[in-house]
């Protein structure tokens, strides 16, 4: 899964790609071709 700052190009990679919001993050999921998965946003872990 790729971590991207913008999902604008990721959502147009394949006709089956969908955008889903889960737990404050934005995901691109693609069941027919899972290599197009991507995520944007979320919280950062503290060290």
From Swiss-Prot:
GO cellular-component term (any): ribonucleoprotein complex
Coiled-coil spans in chain: none
Disulphide connectivity of cysteines: none
Ribonucleoprotein keyword on record: yes
SUPFAM superfamilies per UniProt: Ribosomal protein L36
GO biological processes: translation
Pfam families for this protein: Ribosomal_L36
Domain of life: Bacteria
GO molecular function, one term: structural constituent of ribosome
Keywords: Ribonucleoprotein, Ribosomal protein
Protein family: Belongs to the bacterial ribosomal protein bL36 family.
PANTHER family found in the cross-reference section: 50S RIBOSOMAL PROTEIN L36 2, LARGE RIBOSOMAL SUBUNIT PROTEIN BL36B
HAMAP family: Ribosomal_bL36
Protein name per UniProt: Large ribosomal subunit protein bL36B
Species of provenance: Yersinia pestis
